Amino acid sequence: MHVSNVLGIENPVKELGRRVHEQGGYFVVDGAQSVPHVKVDVTEIGCDFLAFSAHKLFGPFGMGVLWGKDELLNAMPPMLTGCEIIYNVKKKDDKWANLP
């Protein structure tokens, strides 16, 4: 969690991310409370993924954003397919469309 919704404390995510990366892990930041109120620079934070919900930005419930580094997102196969997500279909080797 980047910022606490109870106390408003900004957690030391840059330091936490450094520690996670030292152990070979991926660093995922919950930006639900921070994104609507402060400028969040994912490069400065050093996170691999940042997630936040749309309703905190007066958007619809049930929607949100998952930002991720290109190389990590490209390594993940899509959970759902359709709507122009497949670039080329073959029997053994599908090619996914580029990230938006």
Go through the PLM ranges and name each one.
Residues 1-100:
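Pyridoxal 5′-phosphate
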